Regions:
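Post-transcriptional modification and biogenesis factors for structured RNAs
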Residues: 1-232
Length: 232
């Protein structure tokens, strides 16, 4: 399965190297870098000791949207305070969600933000699920390399599961659901309700395959009734 880790605008080459080393240790091999050239600094390879192949094969993208273009389901790490009205999953919950998603999507990605400011709200809107690491400190802080290690350790089980090939159309269920819900909110004249829209979009990320199929049926019935009502 395609499952890259994506680092958005990393500033410190040492953090890229540490991320690559953590990935290698836990069996992850695909690294994508967005809007940064820090990976070319010699410090990247020095810190990535033993994980030079990940550095050699990393892919660079101009924007997060470009890096996610071939991804069916994406998860972004963020602090709870940045989450607005969104659903917020722990690393343990993310593991269970991705193990289920692995049965019916063809590609997944884990996104990490900038060292100093994380991901913008616009970037958070591009992913399917948000997650963060619960910490006890009053002013909790993990550097990028540490955060990558936590998630690679937690999600290592994904590398041990042989996922079946996704059936045609299944991998696109979530994207289709998002589009249908957005269109329905417009038709109901409630698209300006940001809190509800955010809640709906983020809750889609935790749906299992059967739930997604049932929601498609429900939306179909709602859309049909709206058409019949307008026609009457």
């Amino acid at each position: 399965m395609l499952f890259p880790l994506i680092l958005v605008s990393p500033a410190r080459p040492e953090n890229i190297g540490a991320a690559a080393r953590a990935m290698k240790t836990m069996g992850f091999t695909q690294l994508r870098i967005v809007a940064s050239e820090a990976q070319h600094d010699p410090a990247t390879r020095r810190v990535a000791h033993g994980a030079g192949d990940i550095i050699d094969n990393l892919q660079h993208y101009a924007t997060l949207a470009d890096a996610l273009a071939d991804i069916d389901f994406s998860v972004a790490t963020t602090a709870r305070s940045r989450a607005k009205y969104r659903y917020y999953a722990t690393p343990q919950q993310v593991e269970n969600i991705l193990l289920e998603k692995q049965q019916w999507v063809s590609s997944m990605a884990l996104v990490f933000g900038r060292e100093d400011s994380g991901l913008t709200n616009e970037e958070l809107d591009q992913v399917d699920l948000l997650t963060g690491i619960p910490m006890a400190a009053d002013y909790p802080s993990l550097n990028l390399g540490q955060a990558v290690m936590v998630y690679c350790y937690q999600l290592a089980a994904l590398n041990k599961v042989v996922a079946p090939a996704a059936a045609p159309g299944e991998a696109g269920q979530l994207a289709a659901l998002r589009q249908r819900i957005e269109q329905l909110l417009v038709r109901l004249n409630v698209s300006d309700d940001e809190k509800m829209a955010d809640w709906l979009q983020q809750r889609l990320g935790v749906l299992e395959q059967r739930d997604s199929a049932m929601l498609h049926r429900l939306l179909h019935d709602i859309e049909k009734n709206l058409i019949d009502k307008n026609a009457g």
